[in-house]
């Protein structure tokens, strides 16, 4: 789950990380009132969307008068903000964050992320803040450092100092940087985040350290422990199909292809998409119905896939372990009738009650194309949608 910058800064502030004063706004009038309350003399008007690169896309602008705030807020609110993370369609700006202008002397990058290989928390930092870390990694990889923190020990002073030294933090700011990094680690762990990113972390002319941006991703599996974080969720920023799928406990991610995929198990789902690609097709989605699928869940899965006008065919690939093939067959038959299916459907089933499931499909009278292997299934659905 992602949240907005202003919400992330509220979390950082609660953990003692210095951030500028700011007020969210949902209308131009609220933006003006926020600027008046902050007092100026300089404000930053920031679009709030769940994507990076807002500045380059025209979503972050400096205002030096209240009239500037009013004009800029009017320009940004409601715009389709396009960045390298939104795709060509962009995202509509529905919220703004009006923030005190900052005295920027030097910008740094710092983030905490789970490193599955080392089973530790990786602190990634760079002296090249204020720009995409991907660009830095490509053009100046030597300017990125990584320090791995053992969650059983926590971030030590020595590790925090290693990060500070690695990004060339001046001596008079090292102590505060160590403090900020350790608070950032505490924040990361206690909120069950999967990513916390500050870009930029600013050092002003007085040597003071402050987070000028905040990006959070949270582990969805831990949200039951954090109702205060769930309250930050903004459904307007999420794919409507993915929101609908979550209501039925379906793991769904939209893609750009034209072949809908319904699979049980994340690994098999990814292998299915790879196989479709191998045989010249393009998957329209990732969809894992899980091990407890019912006829209702399968029907809803079909409805969600078919809401995408690009879907020209569907491939169902089931391995019957916990999930019995006859249960899926019943769900597929029910779904086909419920949605009045009009696109080609290929079904491949293996495992528990496989023969019964296949017989149910064959006896249904529906134009279902059967397949025994993944390669055969992929070949048939790719041919059917061309």
Swiss-Prot record:
PANTHER family assigned to the protein according to its UniProt record, in alphabetical order? SUCCINATE--COA LIGASE [GDP-FORMING] SUBUNIT BETA, MITOCHONDRIAL, SUCCINYL-COA SYNTHETASE BETA CHAIN
Matches recorded under Pfam families:
ATP-grasp_2, Ligase_CoA
Please tell me one Gene Ontology term that the record gives under cellular component: cytosol
Organism lineage string: Bacteria, Pseudomonadati, Pseudomonadota, Betaproteobacteria, Burkholderiales
For this entry, the protein name equals Succinate--CoA ligase [ADP-forming] subunit beta
Q: Which residues form the signal peptide?
A: none
Q: How is the cofactor bound?
A: Binds 1 Mg(2+) ion per subunit.
State the protein's purpose: Succinyl-CoA synthetase functions in the citric acid cycle (TCA), coupling the hydrolysis of succinyl-CoA to the synthesis of either ATP or GTP and thus represents the only step of substrate-level phosphorylation in the TCA. The beta subunit provides nucleotide specificity of the enzyme and binds the substrate succinate, while the binding sites for coenzyme A and phosphate are found in the alpha subunit.
